[in-house]
Amino acid sequence: TVKTEPTRFDDGETRVAVILPFLLDRFAPEEQGRMVEFYQGFLMAAERLKNEKHSFEINTFDSGFKEKSLDSLINSGALDNMDIIIGAYYPNHNKQLGRFALEKRIPLVIPFSNRKDELYNNPMVFFVNTLQSSIMNDVTGNFVKRFPDANVIFVEDTIKSNKESFIKSM
């Protein structure tokens, strides 16, 4: 038999930190609604796992708006004993949490971002959304295979568009 080291999940209860911008200090219904909807889905998933005999301690934190730093939360020690951290939303918050997760060896799940940045090489960071750059070749290859003789016209909104590399690859 192979002797294994105990993992952070061996004590029977998983300590989860959820860090999202609920924006409790301002009125932003669209952004707040998106976070509340995600959180409700998270709680439904946790409830289902509880029904399968998994035990959770869920700690929820409001990260605030993007200009707010997470230093006070990180320095408070509230995250030190978490088994997993879910969040945040804004890139600057993700960077702060990524450094913390690496230092403390706590897995960080980023549910919203799909941007390739310095967190991409952090072994403690897990992205839920697939990076667009990692699927671009498959999408364009399949399109060209399926529609080899198609005359395609792309209409691009040059103000909001970030699809230039996709369009050029087609």
Predicted ranges, named:
Residues 86-87, 93-155, 160-166:
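Extracytoplasmic ligand/sensor domains, especially the bilobed periplasmic-binding protein
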Residues 67-83:
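Short, well-structured alpha-helical segments in soluble
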Residues 27-40, 161-165:
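Glycine- and acidic-residue-enriched helix-capping/strand-helix junction motifs
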Residues 19-21, 61, 153-156:
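Short hydrophobic segments within beta-strands
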Residues 1-20, 27:
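Pro/Ala/Gly-rich low-complexity, hydrophilic intrinsically disordered segments
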Residues 15, 83-84:
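Structural motif
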Residues 35-62:
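Signal peptide-proximal N-terminal region
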Residues 21, 43, 47-51, 75-79, ...:
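Sec-exported extracytoplasmic/periplasmic mature domains
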